[in-house]
UniProtKB/Swiss-Prot annotation:
Protein name: 4-hydroxy-tetrahydrodipicolinate reductase
Species this chain originates from: Rickettsia prowazekii (strain Madrid E)
Gene3D superfamilies: Dihydrodipicolinate Reductase, domain 2 (3.30.360.10), NAD(P)-binding Rossmann-like Domain (3.40.50.720)
Active site: 134 (proton donor/acceptor), 138 (proton donor)
Reaction(s) catalysed (UniProt annotation): (S)-2,3,4,5-tetrahydrodipicolinate + NAD(+) + H2O = (2S,4S)-4-hydroxy-2,3,4,5-tetrahydrodipicolinate + NADH + H(+); (S)-2,3,4,5-tetrahydrodipicolinate + NADP(+) + H2O = (2S,4S)-4-hydroxy-2,3,4,5-tetrahydrodipicolinate + NADPH + H(+)
Pfam families hit by this protein: DapB_C, DapB_N
One GO CC annotation: cytoplasm
Binding site for (S)-2,3,4,5-tetrahydrodipicolinate: 135, 144-145
HAMAP family noted in UniProt: DapB
UniProt binding sites for NAD(+): 8-13, 78-80, 102-105
EC number: 1.17.1.8
Family: Belongs to the DapB family.
Amino acid sequence: MINIGLSGSTGKMGKTIIEIIDQFKDCQISGKFNSTNNLNDLDNLCKNSDVIIDFSTPEVSEKLINYALKHNTKLVIGTTGLKDQHFKLLEKAAQTLPVLYSANMSIGANLLNYLAKKITKILDEYDVEILEMHHRNKKDSPSGTALMLASTIASAKGFNIIFNRDNRIKSKKEIGISSLRGGNVHGIHEIFFLGNDEIITLKHEALNKNSFAIGAIKSAIWIQNKPSALYSMQDIYKV
């Protein structure tokens, strides 16, 4: 039985993981951490768990990584809004233990990322723009998934990523990200490939949080026998 510690247990993702964990017979929730706990409680969470699934905040994730290193606890990080300092810490941790990070753990979003990379290389002369939409209470903007998609396309094209075009026209070598917030939207991401005579659109829409939670739990199971390294969902889904 795999003991999974859950960081961010009272958030939308944490609650969904708790609701569906019984679908997986080879793992169980061994401990929970939420915003009402003291950050030092992460010590016991790591000590009593084989792997931690983290959907919390950048501040909590940073503390969690340090305790995971102390107890050699595997990590599955889905927290968004991380900065360079956090990614450097993830890379450091991955030298000692297996770590999986992804801004989106659904198979659909990762397939979208795969298709975007393939199409980008074919549609070399097309402009590319990304639109993402989430519920009114989402804290980070643009979303981690939008940044993942933009980074994939930018790497393939050699483009820059921008978030604001006040009083200037679009440059040929840039990808713009637009964010909408409202209602109870779980997550919509659209990639527009804009040519002179046609527009090609790729779209992924999450109907609920289940696909993200399933991906997180599968990641926690998958990572058990893996060597120390920094993994992504592409390693699991082979895309």
